[in-house]
Swiss-Prot record:
Name of the protein this chain belongs to: Transcriptional repressor NrdR
PROSITE patterns: ATP_CONE
HAMAP family reported in the protein's UniProt record: NrdR
Transmembrane domains' residue ranges: none
Gene: nrdR
Keyword ATP-binding appears in the UniProt entry: yes
Length: 164
């Protein structure tokens, strides 16, 4: 690696260790030409897909927007900030795992809804009402009914009957 001070082409690694969060390798380097030391960090470069909006325009994926929209839906709900962060990470991992270069904003909204559904029912309905642009109460009822249908507990097994 090139020295940032004297521009010498070859530096020596003096110390390497994993960063506290485990997401990077911290390296202390020394330049043999000027004898100065500096620190570098080695991280994995993740290429998240760009987002294709409804109007066809494209923008970079922004995790902060995902977190902000989830926080808004979860406002005054008993959900920890760590749970929101973990949900945003799961969305990122799903996008990375897809291998696609672009994701439609509609798909991103569905991923957020799925995460909110698992975190908090009220937040899920709140987000759905804005995301799907509800115009009347029947649309709320439809979402709630769908939620009840898909999240209904399994039916209790029938009790055996005795023969007399």
């Amino acid at each position: 690696m090139r020295c940032p001070f004297c521009r010498h082409d070859d530096t020596q690694v003096v110390d390497s260790r994993v960063s506290e969060d485990g997401a990077a390798i911290r390296r202390r380097r020394r330049c043999p030409a000027c004898d100065k030391r500096f620190t570098t960090y080695e991280r994995v470069e993740l290429a998240l897909p760009s987002v294709v909006k409804k109007d066809g325009s494209r923008t970079e994926f922004d995790r902060r927007k995902i977190v902000a929209s989830m926080q808004l839906a979860l406002r005054k709900r008993p959900v920890a900030a760590d749970a929101i962060d973990a949900a945003a990470s799961r969305i990122e991992y799903q996008l990375l795992g897809s291998g696609e270069r672009e994701v439609r904003s509609e798909r991103l909204g569905e991923l957020v809804m799925n995460e909110l559904r698992a975190l908090d029912t009220i937040a899920y309905v709140r987000f759905a009402s804005v995301y799907r642009r509800f115009e009347d109460v029947s649309e709320f009822e439809d979402v709630i009914e769908e939620f009840r249908r898909t999240n209904a507990p399994p039916a209790a097994p029938a009790k055996p009957t005795r023969k007399r």
